[in-house]
Amino acid sequence: MMLYFFDPVYMMLAVLGYFVMLLLASTIAPKVASRVSGKFSLFTSMVLLAGMILAISAAIIYLILAYAGVYISFYGLIIFLLIINLLMYLLSPYIINLSYGAQRDERLQMVVNSVARRLNVKPPKAVVVRSPPNAFAYGNFLTGKFVAVSESLMRMLSQEELEAVIGHEIGHHKHRDNAVMLLFGLLPSVIFYLGYALLHSSMRDDRRGAQLAAIGIAAVIVSFIVQILVLAFSRLREYYADFEGVRATNKDAMQRSLAKIHLFYHRYPDYLAPIQDSKFRTLFIYAFTNAVAEPITRADIEALKNMKVSPIQEFLSTHPPLPKRLRFIESIRVF
């Protein structure tokens, strides 16, 4: 990646892409979201969004292959990105275990087993980690599945609240979110680097240079649009995991657990930095979007549900903002 730092083409594309993302997140995305909000169920929304991501990605990749011809080793790029991401997928559980000092815990395992039975899934391995209050799910077919909970979070939550958090994390395993988001996360990268390669190719082609450059720039812009859609898809998966937390316990327990974590980081902001800077922050149950309230009582939670959310913060985040999560949990009907 250091080579790209000195590449003016790469830097130009990166700046262009981030400008596109900010424009989408601040103007277009909120308007589109407001129009479709509430019109579809959570599952239908995920299916439609996944279909849109795949359709847009397939269309731009087909366009590049159809018009770029032999200028890009497309399959070589795909294989390279797949290998890199597969290695990260396989090695990340070992890295997480070392980074956070993960240790098996029998008491936590009993809670995980109980919640897993309610959700009709095989219980993952329960580990306690050294970190500020948080929880996350990780693992693969080699290491097995893990649910990690920090010692501080275990002390902070009641038994029922802890079960709600664990239900959320088991939900990620149940929905295969790690693998799903790995695959969807590849698409923006593939499109971006195809566009980047096309722009370089255009400089060496006097006959088709302008055409290749135009397609390359379009591909880069589309890659950031797809990235916005992938982030939206990730937020829907978080809602889906919250649904499992409610199924495992109840709405109030799920809301209280999120509110307690929220309150901790508002009172002790110094603990935010190591979580926000972590390479694994997308795994955490709590993401730090618009964290300013102090929910202690039910009235505090009700007030938090009605807080305004920054569109840019929301649309550039992998997790929904807390007010929207609380409102979603309130709307859940479990049969």
From Swiss-Prot:
Protein name: Protease HtpX homolog
Main location class: membrane
Highest taxon listed in the record's lineage: Archaea
Enzyme Commission number(s) of this protein: 3.4.24.-
UniProt KW RNA-binding keyword: no
Membrane topology designation: Multi-pass membrane protein
Record organism: Archaeoglobus fulgidus (strain ATCC 49558 / DSM 4304 / JCM 9628 / NBRC 100126 / VC-16)
This protein's GO CC annotations: plasma membrane
Residues forming the catalytic site: E169
Localization: Cell membrane
One protein family per Pfam: Peptidase_M48
Top EC class for this record: hydrolase
